[in-house]
């Protein structure tokens, strides 16, 4: 089969308004949505990328289409919905970190449905090396969850590998449902990208080795556990390697995990081992926290290579 794409990602893209000043309040307009951020990060890293979603036929949706065109992301899989809006979110900052407020109820992306996969997306999934999804892809609505699982089953049937990022947002769904759906996604995926915080909330496990054991026991062949400021741990089920963080002056960590995921997949498509790809993605994510917003600070390869130079 022709693998004309490296990564297809499925989820919800949104307009972002990121706080740059508290008094008086000022916000910088940008773009977000975890899997869209990851898709753009992968494209900037040189991957051939497509995005799968629904958008409103509104100004916000038009801006997102322009963004993907600028970034070289294939939009064949974007379905425009005249009956629902595109989603919007706000990011505020304080001494405890960054906080999100969403205006996404009833969004076009929440109207994704399992029939969209067979009707519109199966061929794109089959043309790609990787399908990337997240916990948010599952959480935004029951029908979107059905679409995400249909996409995963389509990927497995066509030999496309699946990467799944935990991205737990308990504001979107109850813990019991999140636990059940994410556990099933782990069973289906080839590469699981959890954070320690997410897995502690989902499973009650506090130690990284216990989380890695749980992940492999529930079906994930490869796991990259994100530890925030403590770096990452890469595991193939036999060997575990800790990758130290890069010390940088963090301004806004909004899309750091998405940057990590996109760069990791892009490097795997270029032939890196999982450890090599994770070291590259670790550096890219460190660079991404030095600017405001989820998309604008996503680095290009030259900057990542410069940080990796001894």
Regions inferred by a protein language model and the residue ranges of each:
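Structural alpha-helical scaffold elements that stabilize or flank donor/cofactor-binding regions
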Residues: 123-124, 184-185, 216
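Short, electropositive alpha-helical surface patch
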Residues: 61-73, 155, 179-188, 248
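Glycine-rich phosphate/adenosyl-contacting loop at the front of the ribokinase-like
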Residues: 1-74, 251
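Conserved beta-alpha-beta core of the PfkB/ribokinase-like small-molecule kinase fold
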Residues: 130-213, 230-231
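Conserved phosphate-binding/catalytic region of the ribokinase-like
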Residues: 1-8, 153-157, 204-310
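General beta-strand structural signal in soluble alpha/beta enzymes
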Residues: 9-10, 77, 163-164, 193-194, ...
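Conserved N-terminal subdomain of the carbohydrate kinase-like
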Residues: 48-135, 306-310
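Short, conserved phosphate/pyrophosphate- and ester-handling motifs at nucleotide-, phospho-/glycolipid
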Residues: 42, 195, 257
């Amino acid at each position: 089969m022709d693998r004309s794409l490296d990564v297809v990602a499925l989820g919800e893209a949104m307009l972002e308004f990121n706080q740059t000043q508290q008094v008086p309040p000022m916000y910088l307009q940008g773009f977000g949505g975890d899997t869209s951020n990851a898709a753009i990060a992968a494209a900037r890293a040189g991957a051939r990328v497509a995005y799968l979603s629904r958008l409103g036929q509104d100004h916000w949706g038009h801006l997102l289409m322009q963004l993907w065109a600028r970034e070289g992301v294939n939009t064949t899989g974007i379905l425009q919905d005249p009956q629902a809006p595109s989603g919007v979110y706000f990011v505020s900052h304080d001494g405890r970190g960054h906080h999100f407020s969403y205006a996404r109820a009833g969004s076009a992306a929440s109207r994704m449905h399992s029939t969209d996969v067979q009707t519109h997306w199966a061929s794109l999934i089959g043309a790609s090396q990787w399908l990337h999804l997240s916990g948010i892809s599952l959480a935004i609505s029951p029908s979107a969850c059905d679409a995400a699982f249909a996409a995963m089953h389509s990927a497995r049937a066509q030999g496309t590998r699946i990467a799944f990022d935990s991205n737990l947002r308990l504001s979107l769904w109850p813990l019991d449902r999140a636990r059940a759906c994410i556990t099933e996604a782990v069973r289906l995926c080839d590469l699981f990208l959890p954070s320690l915080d997410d897995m502690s909330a989902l499973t009650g496990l506090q130690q990284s080795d216990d989380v890695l054991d749980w992940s492999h026991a529930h079906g994930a062949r490869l796991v990259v556990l994100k530890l925030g400021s403590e770096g990452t741990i890469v595991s193939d089920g036999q060997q575990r390697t800790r990758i130290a963080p890069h010390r940088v002056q963090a301004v806004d960590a909004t899309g750091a995990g998405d940057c990590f995921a996109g760069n990791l997949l892009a490097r795997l498509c270029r032939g890196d081992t999982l450890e090599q790809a994770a070291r590259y993605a670790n550096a890219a994510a460190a660079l991404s926290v030095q600017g405001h917003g989820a998309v604008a600070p996503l680095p290009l390869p030259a900057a990542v290579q410069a940080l990796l130079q001894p």
